């Protein structure tokens, strides 16, 4: 599975295994060096010697509208259809970068967190709960 974090300046790509935690072959590319996300992905795949991915999951800075994201402070427009066509896969997921951060919260360990301010942090409850993510943007 190809995963990416796409911002206004950088696109960070990696490969992930759907059966294991973590990722490999991480690489950061400058968005301005490529005319499209598809061109950047192809460069990344060529550079690491990988074939086209079966699954693509991209998190980007910008709102998801229908099946596309216009990346904030970047000339790229990500669309499910263009990515599906370019890499011959129907398994394409686009999400906002803060949505991706929220999905990571349940798997964070104690060493992944740094308390800021007061009160002292409490462990997350088991089960379903609401998550809020605060940051710039």
Language-model-detected regions and their locations in the chain:
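A gly/proline- and charged-residue-enriched helix-loop-helix capping module
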Residues: 103-133
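Short beta-strand-loop/turn "lid" adjacent to the catalytic site in phosphate-handling enzymes
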Residues: 49-94, 99-112
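Noncatalytic linker/hinge segments flanking ATPase motor cores
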Residues: 13, 44, 92-103, 134-137
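Short glycine-aspartate micro-motif
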Residues: 1-5, 55-57, 93, 130-135
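Short glycine-rich anion-binding loops that position phosphate/pyrophosphate groups of nucleotides
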Residues: 9, 61-64, 136-137
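A generic local structural motif
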Residues: 42-44, 80, 117-120
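Short glycine-rich, Thr/Ser-proximal phosphate-binding strand/loop in the N-terminal lobe
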Residues: 1-43
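Short, glycine- and charge-enriched coil/turn segments that flank and shape catalytic ligand pockets
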Residues: 18-24, 46-51, 124-126
């Amino acid at each position: 599975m190809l995963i990416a974090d796409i911002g206004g300046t950088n696109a960070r790509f990696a490969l992930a295994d759907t059966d294991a935690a973590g990722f490999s072959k991480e690489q950061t590319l400058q968005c301005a060096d490529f005319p499209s996300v598809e061109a950047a992905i192809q460069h990344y795949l060529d550079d690491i010697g990988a074939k086209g991915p079966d699954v693509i999951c991209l998190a980007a800075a910008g709102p998801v509208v229908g099946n596309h994201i216009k990346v904030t402070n970047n000339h790229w427009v990500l669309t499910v259809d263009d990515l599906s066509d370019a890499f011959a896969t129907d398994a394409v997921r686009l999400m906002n970068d803060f949505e991706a951060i929220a999905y990571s919260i349940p798997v964070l360990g104690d060493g992944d967190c740094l308390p800021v301010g007061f009160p002292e942090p409490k462990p997350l409850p088991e089960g379903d709960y609401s998550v809020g993510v605060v940051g710039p943007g």
